[in-house]
Amino acid sequence: MYIPAIGLVAGFEHESCRLVDGLIDPATLNLACAYTAPDRPYRLPGSNADDIVVIAGHAGAGTAAVFDPMYNADADHHNVQVGDVMYIRTETSGDHWLKYTASDLHSPEKGSLSQDVSVWGEGATPGRLLTISCIQPSFAPSVRNAVVGWQFAGVAGPGAELPPPVLPQGM
């Protein structure tokens, strides 16, 4: 996963995001995870995902975490802006990248996130992807989430409709 505008580069856990007390809680600080569940319509990232894709990652306070670049808790604002792009490469996509464009930004209370129609939509939402993290203020508990809505924009890479991303060295 790569978001050029904020320099975020992330790998993924091999398993679906775990749940702790009914809330998504990635198993590690340094990897993102995709959330799927038999009782939810969530899908894995793909060019033909027929419903919403959910990717989660931790933000840290006093320790580094994978989604730290997504939100500035001290200034209380998203670092991703509407129109920024994100690239995801999956086992299925091979050398190709799935390209998404940021469409909406949210910072709901954790307790209301699961029912927030402005985040989840109503009915199936093909091509929609959410990145979800905690807003982790310094020396305070996390009570809100940083959520970015993304819309699938196409496939990038060799022989695809879009050019591949220019990756940072070492990726």
What kind of region is each of these model predictions?
Residues 1-171:
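Solvent-exposed, non-transmembrane regions of membrane-associated and secreted proteins
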